[in-house]
């Protein structure tokens, strides 16, 4: 098992995000120093943590004495000197480039040479934040999602000078800390916010143009995307000014399409939440609302992949975990069809003189977008096959078994590969066959599909067992059912 090499974490900032990040590390058994310039703000941050821990006691996630023990490991300080024994320091102050830089200049004076420094920024390039640091190789971005103690997604963003060792060390540890990290390129918006913020903004444009009311747009969006809350309700939850400022930051880098709508700006100026019951504003046009919100999602997700920010599977993973969407952008595209998806994007992007992303051009004529649930890595003469469904505990479904078979046969037939290792990403090796798959097939009365899936699995296991090349399962987490067979 991986060993935790971080024992004391510093969190700079005690607001909503800072206190939640501190809570996350407290719940994982670490000592935490929370630093802020104002002791009253620090006390409020600690009180907020106490409220959430009390809720965890009520839900029987932890016990009362466990809550007290956690709070006993939380230290409040208005001095950067208190960070001197920390092995990891995360900044979570408000989004101001110079303020954040000054925070790290001060922190670097006190921390040891091996301490990892990280920013929770959602807006600024990591390489820009790193400029004043004397050792930028130990600095990177770790972007949490609300609520940081509960939401499992963390985007890890290495800057230009971040060392591979720093990135890999934190990536490994976030799995140990019960998070699901994805490594993304250092661009504004990173991966998830790059398409999520324009999705929110487009909803306000649809309202502005009279295609629906707040209530009707929210309702239709919930139905189409399968969400618990629509874009206006989500902005109320996370803060409408955040959506506006994030839109402005994106527009500064990527162009006018990303600019906040006039309606969004006015709402921020009013200092009021959206009226979620409001049915005023034009006539409902469900087709326009659906097509444009999907087009924003599909188009920008395709830009992300075209630019090498991350791959389609990790983009979908980010949407499912970070935003709690049932399906990610590319899974949605596969569901409604690539041809229709492409037409939606072309229609929207042409209004803004934006080119069709290269990824969508290259996907033309294909039936589906290939989503890699199983990755293959070559390390010298060793082939490593990694199952990448951490949000599903790497449970086996039809696509996973098919891709496992393909990757195994590739290595089996490659004379340069002398041995093959199987491993699972996250906290499980393989938690058996997908229960969801069986329930869906039973509901569809498709027992033949279940039989075919079982046969595919047994064929794969037989090939592995009879392979003349040494095979090994690297167990770093649970293995159940089909995972034990594998």
Language-model features, listed with the residues they occupy:
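Residues forming the Rossmann-fold NAD(P)(H) cofactor-binding site
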Residues: 19, 398, 484
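N-terminal glycine-rich phosphate-binding loop for ADP-containing cofactors
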Residues: 1-380, 388-391, 441, 445
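Active-site-proximal alpha-helical scaffold in enzymes
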Residues: 204, 484-486
């Amino acid at each position: 098992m991986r060993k935790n090499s971080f024992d004391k974490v510093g969190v700079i900032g005690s607001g909503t995000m800072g206190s939640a990040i501190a809570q996350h590390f407290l719940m994982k058994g670490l000592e935490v120093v929370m630093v802020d310039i104002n002791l009253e703000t620090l006390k409020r941050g600690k009180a907020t943590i106490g409220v959430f821990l009390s809720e965890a006691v009520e839900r029987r996630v932890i016990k009362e004495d466990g809550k007290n023990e956690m709070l006993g490991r939380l230290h409040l300080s208005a001095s950067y000197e208190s960070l001197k024994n920390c092995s990891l320091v995360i900044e979570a102050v408000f989004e101001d480039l110079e303020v954040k830089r000054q925070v790290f200049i001060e922190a670097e004076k006190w921390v040891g040479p091996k301490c990892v420094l990280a920013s929770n920024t959602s807006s600024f390039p990591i390489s820009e934040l790193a400029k004043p640091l004397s050792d930028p190789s130990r600095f990177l971005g770790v972007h949490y999602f609300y609520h940081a103690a509960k939401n499992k997604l963390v985007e890890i963003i290495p800057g230009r000078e971040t060392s591979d060792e720093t990135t890999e060390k934190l990536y490994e540890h976030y799995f140990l800390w019960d998070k699901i990290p994805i490594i993304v390129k250092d661009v504004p918006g990173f991966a998830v916010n790059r398409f999520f913020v324009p999705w929110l903004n487009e909803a306000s444009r649809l309202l502005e143009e009279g295609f629906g009311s707040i209530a009707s747009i929210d309702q239709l969006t919930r139905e189409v995307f399968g969400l618990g809350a629509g874009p206006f309700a989500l902005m109320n939850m996370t803060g409408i000014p955040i959506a506006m400022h994030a839109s402005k930051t994106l527009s500064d880098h990527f162009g006018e399409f990303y600019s906040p709508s006039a309606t969004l700006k006015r709402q921020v100026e009013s200092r009021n939440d959206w009226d979620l019951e409001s049915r005023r504003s034009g006539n409902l046009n469900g087709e326009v609302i659906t097509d444009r919100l999907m087009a924003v999602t599909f188009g920008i997700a395709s830009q992300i992949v075209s630019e090498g920010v991350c791959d389609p599977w990790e983009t979908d993973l980010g949407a499912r975990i970070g935003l709690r969407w049932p399906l990610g952008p590319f899974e949605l595209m596969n569901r409604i069809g690539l041809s229709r998806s492409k037409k939606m994007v072309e229609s929207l992007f042409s209004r803004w003189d934006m080119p069709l992303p290269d990824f969508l051009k290259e996907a033309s004529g294909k039936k589906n977008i290939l989503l890699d649930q199983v990755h293959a890595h070559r390390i010298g003469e060793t082939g490593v096959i990694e199952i990448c469904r951490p949000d599903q505990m790497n449970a086996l479904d039809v696509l996973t078994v098919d891709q496992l078979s393909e990757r195994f046969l590739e290595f089996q037939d490659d004379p340069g590969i002398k041995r093959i290792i199987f491993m699972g990403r996250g906290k499980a090796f393989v938690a058996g066959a997908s229960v969801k798959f069986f329930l869906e097939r039973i509901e569809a009365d498709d027992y033949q599909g279940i039989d075919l899936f079982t046969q595919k699995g047994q064929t794969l296991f037989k090939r592995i067992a009879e392979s003349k090349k040494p095979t090994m399962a690297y167990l770093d987490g649970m293995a159940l059912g089909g995972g034990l067979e594998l």
